[in-house]
From Swiss-Prot:
InterPro entries: LipOase, LipOase_C, LipOase_C_sf, LipOase_CS, LipOase_Fe_BS, LipOase_plant, Lipoxy_PLAT/LH2, Lipoxygenase_dom_3
Pathway: Lipid metabolism; oxylipin biosynthesis
Residues that bind Fe cation: 523, 528, 714, 718, 862
Species name: Solanum tuberosum
Signal sequence range: none
Main localization (coarse): cytoplasm
Physiological role: Plant lipoxygenases may be involved in a number of diverse aspects of plant physiology including growth and development, pest resistance, and senescence or responses to wounding. May contribute to cell death during the hypersensitive response (HR) by the massive production of free fatty acid hydroperoxides. Catalyzes the hydroperoxidation of lipids containing a cis,cis-1,4-pentadiene structure.
Protein's recorded name: Probable linoleate 9S-lipoxygenase 5
Lineage: Eukaryota, Viridiplantae, Streptophyta, Embryophyta, Tracheophyta
One BP term from GO: lipid oxidation
Catalyses which reaction(s): (9Z,12Z)-octadecadienoate + O2 = (9S)-hydroperoxy-(10E,12Z)-octadecadienoate
């Protein structure tokens, strides 16, 4: 207290007896969040003592200053109090500080404030609450932003009160501030962006390769071409490489966590213990050379499924090498334990995945194989078979005849007495079709250590609602040229002898296909990559005052950061994904080819289900569609979640937009949608399917899709990764040899030791360790996760009707949770648990921290 008085005396600040308005600032000091910066607090204390403090000025929402371009009138500066005594301690490193403003009647009601940080270090500003503003009451400002020292900024830092305004309704004293803040966030498109920058801008995916390391590390630039279209990523402004001026230079691996994203998109708000788990993605990368060296010199194999189970039950000894020793010597033990699940004896050990918790072998059944297409980690691919045999959409002049060779004779005896025509007419035949996506790449992929087929799997919907596979077709390009078509072989179910072992291998080749398509398309492309342009455009074109910004902003949390980290250490040349998924160096290029068929309106769940033929439009059904597979857990729960999101968005948008005319006249909204089409998804700008954004319905539909992608769709394809793929034999990521042919040693091994033959075909031991390490982290919920129906502040808006609508949304989600629990307990719904007895909870809205196999975070945050 005495110290504060001395500071006031030195700096000439003292109390006067005029009218005051008190406020409370909530913030986190840098030293709480940055364990490497022990000097942060000391330096700021010195500056505080010298009078260089944190100042705030209120801005009037009702009275303009004629001498300042009619911008809102400003109050005299006020200063944060008791910085040296740290303020009142709150949760998770937060502190509350008092600030007292000299009240000027000319201010009227404050609608914004300017903050200047004259300290040496940045701090994380959570909120400001003004108490008892004369003739008004309390005013709340939600900030959630890093405030760097004022000298780092070219313009003032401004924060607005929690009252939403459409652009045309903005009070005149705030209008100029609103527009200038958007200009600041857009930047000027030039130069390298620094840590403290807040610039949102676009770039191509031209930073995945590292051509300066050699040709083998060069990668195709994604985006900006008809051949390889792609959504845009956030710009970093790093220099081009010397080897290829079109490619952006990369930062060193050790600096991965410092890759540029706008400062408020960083993981800085995550508590330190969780932050280390994100760092794992980077540190695991250092293990790769060691893994590779071991793999080259001692190609260790799992000899049996018992060997694989040791990963979870007893641990597996990690072979020692110089690189690993250097790593263990240089990393603190507690971090190393987190990274490699070591038990102190250098063993990898992992949590037991749900798929083998109840039964160690049920994953091998045909029923479970099929069920996971409806309730597993990739339930978004299966479609209804509408013509037989299945036909290819590939260009026959380039690829020859790629139509299926499955015949009636292959499957009619497994259709419960139905003919194929009857089965198709009664919606009983379905297909998991990876043929056309993969065939153009199979020849190139098979020049590597991977040996891959393009697959088609036919399934029959049985009377009890379960599916059974009835045929698997594995295809290779013709050895004499692509134009000669496919060389295919059809396999049918068997459970005894060598035929049974061959059938198990056929399912494994399908699982390999599905694993790669899941990771690259269903997961990365359709959620992570597709949503990033919406994050960028929203921050560039919609003011924080805009109601649609307030609606969408929670669904963008951490997305740019996790995507930037992915570019740095996961999807880059030689990264973890290339090492663990079969397309290897062709992985991202393949996803760009698939993006050609991406259609925004088809990302809506009902539209997707109809497109795949697993549902039909039906106005009498609760969600406007009728499922043709009644026991389809992803679709059943998904439609409930979709409907809840749609109702919430409808109520919210109807409150702010009373007519279509307001949508048309909203200049920020129109600029946002134009930029999304022409810049963010610029390679799709001329597509006729884009909503015109001329009506309230188009706005509501588009916002519902955006929220669905960021929340429920991502949850459905992400958080089941460890529960199902944490046991690699169930979802192998690689196949290393072709199907054994009679008369070969491999065929004899298949007869005498089928389990070993299976394990020698799929992902090898070291890639298994790496892959499991990765998906364990990707499947975890952070302790500060915010789930669908939740907000990080109860004061997110001043408008009471949207608050009430949001509460109804939360209540509806709670009812859906009860419904999921009830259905999972009803034995009638066989696909909800299956032979492995893993209840379907991937669309259960809430979750605890950790590896739970449930929970829908608001955003693509991991």
């Amino acid at each position: 207290m005495l110290l504060e008085k001395i500071v006031e005396a030195i700096s000439g600040r003292s109390e006067d007896n005029g009218k005051k308005v008190k406020g409370t600032i909530v913030l986190m000091k840098k030293n709480v969040l940055d364990f490497n910066d022990v000097n942060a607090s000391l330096l700021d204390g010195v500056l505080e003592f010298l009078g260089k403090r944190v100042s705030l000025q209120l801005i009037s929402v009702v009275h303009a200053d004629p001498g300042n371009s009619l911008q809102g009138k400003r109050s005299n500066p006020a200063y944060l109090e008791k910085w040296l005594t740290t303020g009142t301690s709150l949760v998770a490193g937060e502190s509350a500080f008092d600030v007292t403003f000299d009240w000027d009647e000319d201010i009227g009601v404050p609608g914004a404030f300017i903050i200047n940080n004259f300290h040496f270090n940045e701090f994380y500003l959570k909120s400001l609450t003004l108490e008892d503003v004369p003739n008004h009451g309390n005013v709340h400002f939600v900030c959630n932003s890093w405030v760097y020292p004022a000298k780092k900024y070219k313009s003032e830092r401004i924060f607005f009160a929690n009252q939403a305004y459409l652009p045309g309704e903005t009070p005149e004293p705030l209008r100029n501030y609103r527009e200038k803040e958007l200009v600041n966030l857009r930047g000027n498109g030039n130069g390298k962006l620094e840590e403290w920058d807040r610039v949102y801008d676009y770039a191509l995916y031209n930073d995945l390769g590292d051509p300066e390391k050699g040709k083998q590390y060069a990668r195709t630039i994604l985006g900006g071409s008809a051949e390889y279209p792609y959504p845009r990523r956030g710009r970093t402004g790093r220099k081009p490489t010397k080897a290829d001026p079109k490619s952006e230079s990369r930062i060193p691996l050790l600096m991965s966590l410092d890759i540029y994203v706008p400062r408020d998109e960083r993981f800085g708000h995550i508590k330190l213990s969780d932050f280390l788990t994100y760092a794992l993605k980077s540190i695991v990368q250092f293990l790769i050379p060691e893994f590779q060296a071991l793999f080259d010199s001692t190609p260790d194999e799992f000899d049996s499924f018992e060997d694989v189970l040791k990963l979870y039950e007893g641990g597996i000894k990690l072979p020692q090498g110089p690189f690993l020793k250097a790593l263990t010597d240089s990393i603190p033990l507690e971090i190393l334990k987190e990274i490699i699940r070591t038990d102190g004896e250098g063993k990898f050990k992992f949590p037991t995945p749900q798929v083998i918790q109840e039964d160690k072998s049920s994953w091998r059944t045909d029923e479970e194989f099929a069920r996971e297409m409806l309730a597993g980690v990739n339930p978004v691919i299966i479609s209804r078979l509408q013509e037989f045999p299945p036909k290819s959409q590939l260009d026959s002049e380039v690829y020859g005849n790629q139509n299926s060779t499955i015949t009636k004779e292959h499957i009619e005896n497994t259709l419960d007495g139905l003919t194929i025509d009857d089965a198709i007419k009664t919606n009983r035949l379905y297909i998991l079709n990876h043929h056309d996506i993969l065939m153009p790449y199979v020849r190139r992929i098979n020049t590597t250590n991977t040996k891959l087929y393009a697959s088609r799997t036919l399934l029959f919907l049985q009377d009890d609602g379960t599916m059974k596979p009835v045929a698997i077709e594995l295809s290779l390009p013709h050895p004499d040229g692509d134009e000669l078509g496919a060389v295919s072989k059809v396999y049918t179910p068997a459970d005894q002898g060598v035929e049974g072992s061959i059938w198990q291998l056929a399912k494994a080749y399908v699982a390999v296909n599905d694993s790669g398509v899941h990771q690259l398309i269903s997961h990365w492309l359709n959620t992570h990559a597709a949503i990033e342009p919406f994050v960028i455009a929203t921050n560039r074109q919609l003011s924080v005052l805009h109601p649609i910004h307030k609606l969408l902003h929670p669904h963008f949390r951490d997305t740019m950061n996790i995507n930037a980290l992915a570019r740095q250490i996961l999807i880059n040349a030689g990264g973890v994904l290339e090492m663990t998924v079969f397309p290897a160096k062709y992985a991202m290029e393949m996803s760009a080819v698939v993006y050609k068929s991406w259609v925004f309106p088809e990302q809506a769940l009902p539209a997707d289900l109809i497109k795949r033929g697993v549902a039909v439009e039906d106005s009498s059904s609760p969600h406007g569609v009728r499922l043709l597979i009644q026991d389809y857990p992803y679709a059943v729960d998904g439609l409930e979640i979709w409907s809840a999101i749609k109702s919430w968005v409808t109520e919210y948008c109807n409150f702010y937009y009373k007519s279509d005319e307001l949508v048309l006249k909203d200049n920020e909204l129109q600029a946002w949608w134009k930029e999304l089409r022409e810049e963010g998804h610029g390679d799709k700008k001329d597509e006729p399917w884009w909503p015109k954004m001329q009506t309230r319905q188009e706005l509501k539909d588009s916002c519902t899709i955006i929220i669905w992608i960021a929340s429920a769709l991502h949850a459905a394809v992400n958080f089941g990764q460890y529960p199902y793929a944490g046991y690699l034999p169930n979802r192998p990521t690689l196949s290393r040899r072709f199907m054994p042919e009679p008369g070969t040693p491999e065929y004899e091994e298949l007869k005498t030791n089928p389990d070993k033959a299976y394990l020698k075909t799929i992902t090898p031991q070291l890639q298994t360790l790496l892959g499991i390490s990765l998906i364990e982290i990707l499947s975890r919920h952070a302790s500060d996760e915010i789930y669908l129906g939740q907000r990080d502040s109860s004061e997110w808006t001043k408008d009471q009707e949207p608050i009430a609508a949001f509460e109804r949304f939360g209540k509806k989600l709670s009812e859906i949770e009860d419904q999921i629990i009830q259905m999972n307990g009803d034995k009638k719904w066989k696909n909800r648990s299956g032979p492995v007895n893993v209840p379907y909870t991937l669309l259960f809205p809430t979750s605890e921290q950790g590896l739970t196999g449930k929970g829908i975070p608001n955003s693509v945050s991991i």
